[in-house]
């Protein structure tokens, strides 16, 4: 007879750092009711830091293979955790959320968190909320505040990777400032900035960027080339088809670029 595993059993197991976290336990962290969440938060301070990250990584990975689970309750509860790595992973647990209140929280994290990791994850998820706003599925005021925060970061002297991610996230936005921001990034000598500009172009679904994308499809830098191939597919640039074919015939081409190019060419053909 199989013994029933209670959530208290799961928490007791979590506290024992010598034991591996069984896959069977991961579902029991899903969709916690208020009582279970309180139990979880009561024991959380006693869990060793490495063990905390191990659990959160397991939950994040499990989200990708099991569409029936949700760890939003845990994610929300840990957004204010004192450990920046925990906060970053908490945001990843909220990747499927479309709650407007979360967008406001992410905006605050982006502007005020003291650690880079949660700010990076906040930027990435804010991009999804900007898209919801463009689809009129997010209150206009919340979208505007999120866009303002992203623009502030892009124009700041903050971490370069964070600023580039903010540009990519804002690519979904129809704000008039986007044209200048994308152009400025595209004209930089830094390949990383040019690649981010191309990703923003693709997300904009604005054909004004078609020529810029086509001009970089055969760029020598793989970062730029990969982003250009992505953008060509997202913008549905039919003229890119012949260039992608040439790319696929190049035996020295990067494997990742070839794989993406093959997918995008099939997309353009249909």
What are these regions (language model features)?
Residues 1-66, 77, 82-85, 125:
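Intrinsically disordered, serine/threonine- and proline-rich low-complexity regions
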Residues 2-3, 114-115, 119-131:
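Long, contiguous interaction/recruitment modules in multidomain scaffold/adaptor proteins
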Residues 2-9, 32-44, 65-80, 99-112, ...:
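Amphipathic alpha-helical scaffolding segments comprising HEAT/armadillo-like alpha-solenoid repeats
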Residues 15-27, 53-63, 86-91, 127-138, ...:
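Boundary/linker elements of alpha-helical solenoid repeat scaffolds
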Residues 19, 34, 49-53, 84-85, ...:
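Alpha-helix N-cap/helix-start positions at coil->helix boundaries
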Residues 22-23, 53, 57, 88-89, ...:
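Alpha-solenoid HEAT/ARM repeat scaffold
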Residues 60, 95, 127-128, 171, ...:
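Structural signature of alpha-helical solenoid repeat scaffolds
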Residues 254-270:
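Short, compositionally biased segments
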């Amino acid at each position: 007879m199989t013994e029933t595993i209670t959530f208290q059993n799961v928490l007791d197991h979590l506290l024992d750092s010598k034991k591996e976290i069984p896959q069977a336990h991961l579902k029991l962290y899903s969709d916690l009711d208020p009582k279970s969440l309180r139990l979880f938060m009561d024991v959380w301070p006693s869990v060793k830091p490495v063990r905390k990250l191990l659990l959160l990584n397991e939950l994040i990975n499990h989200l990708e293979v099991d569409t029936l689970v949700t760890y939003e309750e845990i994610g929300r509860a840990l957004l204010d955790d004192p450990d920046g790595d925990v906060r970053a992973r908490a945001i990843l647990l909220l990747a499927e959320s479309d709650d407007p209140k979360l967008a406001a929280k992410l905006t605050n994290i982006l502007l005020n968190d003291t650690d880079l990791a949660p700010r990076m994850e906040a930027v990435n998820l804010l991009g999804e909320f900007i898209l919801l706003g463009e689809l009129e599925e997010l209150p206009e005021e919340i979208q505007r505040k999120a866009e303002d925060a992203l623009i502030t970061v892009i124009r700041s002297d903050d971490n370069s990777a964070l600023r580039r991610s903010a540009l990519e996230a804002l690519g979904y936005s129809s704000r008039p400032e986007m044209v200048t921001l994308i152009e400025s990034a595209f004209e930089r000598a830094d390949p990383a900035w040019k690649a981010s500009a191309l990703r923003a172009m693709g997300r904009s679904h604005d054909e004004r960027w078609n020529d810029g994308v086509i001009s970089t499809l055969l760029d020598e830098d793989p970062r730029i080339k990969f982003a250009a191939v992505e953008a060509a597919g997202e913008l549905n640039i039919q003229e890119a088809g012949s260039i992608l074919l040439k790319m696929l015939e190049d035996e020295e081409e990067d494997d990742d670029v070839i794989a993406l190019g093959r997918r995008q060419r099939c997309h353009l053909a249909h």
